[in-house]
Regions:
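Glycine-rich phosphate-binding loop plus the immediately following alpha-helix
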Residues: 47, 53-81, 94-170
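Catalytic phosphate/nucleotide-handling subdomain of diverse soluble enzymes
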Residues: 96, 108-113, 134, 206-298
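Short beta-strand-loop/turn "lid" adjacent to the catalytic site in phosphate-handling enzymes
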Residues: 1-41
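A contiguous, well-structured pocket-lining segment that forms one wall/lid of small-molecule binding clefts
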Residues: 141-222, 234-247
């Protein structure tokens, strides 16, 4: 991590004041209030000789939250700063992150938050890339299904898919923080590489589409903007669009990658934790009752100046 930071600083000549360091989550159990990320914030600060904010999730867990998702406040920032200049107020703007797990943020206007008329709502809604990636890694030399190529070759086993959908009832309602260990790929055991990928991708898409249907605003036109690696999986994105559970009005103009609105989707997550680090420094909330389930809006993160 330190080498990566040093390389970026050397290449960009950025004068860094503060680094938000999340690390790699290796275990997360919201019910037991346990979360563990790889990465030593103290050592990183020492090596790069900069202030570091790390351990973002613990304070939320201590205050009754589930420790995730933490990015909604940043999703709300970019929705207000960039998206709502192009979209009129008749739109309900939702941001979906399809990473290992999929989560959704219903954004609101800042002035409505300030006046306490509305709150940001967010939650984990479904698996994201985790099932597809695990299957591909276990059954091939590839690490993931680039562009959904393998899934597009395969044929979905509808019987297995329907049984899996009955067995994995995620929501609605959507209350629990999800971890990749909440799911497994055993239900596609015995299928070919391609058929397994196709079945898992359609399973993921149907779970996501159920959530989109649940969270659509009945009083406004809904737009869903997608970030995270899953947006690059063409098969997955098309499967969400053609899903029988999908919002009827959903199409290729209102279910789109965030790049369509000038936002770099590969860096939303990293930018989010930079923003959370600043909010932590200012002791501003990073999690909220309607995003993580915490008892009250709380800040989070530990700042270290270890040099």
């Amino acid at each position: 991590h330190a080498n990566a930071v040093k390389e970026i600083l050397n290449n960009t000549k950025i004068d860094l004041d503060l680094l938000g360091f999340h690390g790699q989550t290796i275990f997360h159990d919201s019910k037991k209030k346990i979360t563990k990320q790889l990465g030593d914030g103290k050592l990183l600060s020492q090596l790069i000789k900069k202030k570091v904010v790390y351990d973002f999730r613990q304070n939320d867990l201590k205050n009754g939250g589930q420790g995730a998702p933490l990015t909604p406040i940043f999703h709300n920032l970019i929705a207000n700063k960039y998206l709502k200049k192009e979209l009129d107020k008749s739109y309900s703007v939702n941001i979906i992150n399809i990473g290992g797990i999929s989560n959704l943020t219903k954004t609101v206007e800042w002035d409505k938050i300030d006046k306490k008329k509305e709150v940001i709502k967010a939650c984990d809604i479904a698996p994201g890339n985790c099932l597809i990636d695990e299957w591909v890694r276990k059954n091939s030399k590839k690490r993931y299904d680039a562009n959904g190529t393998l899934a597009s070759i395969g044929n979905t086993d509808r019987l297995i898919l329907n049984q899996a959908l009955e067995n994995f009832n995620i929501g609605p309602p959507y209350k629990d923080s999800l971890d990749i260990k909440d799911f497994d790929i055993s239900f596609v055991k015995g299928l070919s590489l391609e058929d397994g990928v196709s079945t898992l991708a359609d399973f993921t898409a149907l779970q996501i589409s159920r959530a989109l249907n649940y969270f659509k605003d009945p009083t406004k036109k809904s737009i869903f903007l997608v970030c995270g690696g899953g947006r690059k999986n063409k098969y997955l994105m098309n499967s969400i669009l053609r899903s029988v559970d999908t919002v009827k009005e959903l199409n290729e103009t209102n279910f789109v990658p965030v790049e369509d609105y000038g936002i770099e989707g590969d860096f939303v997550e990293s930018q989010a934790f930079g923003y959370l680090a600043i909010r932590s420094l200012l002791n501003l909330p990073i999690s909220f009752p309607d995003t993580t389930g915490c008892n009250d809006s709380v800040s989070g993160g530990v700042m270290i100046n270890n040099f």
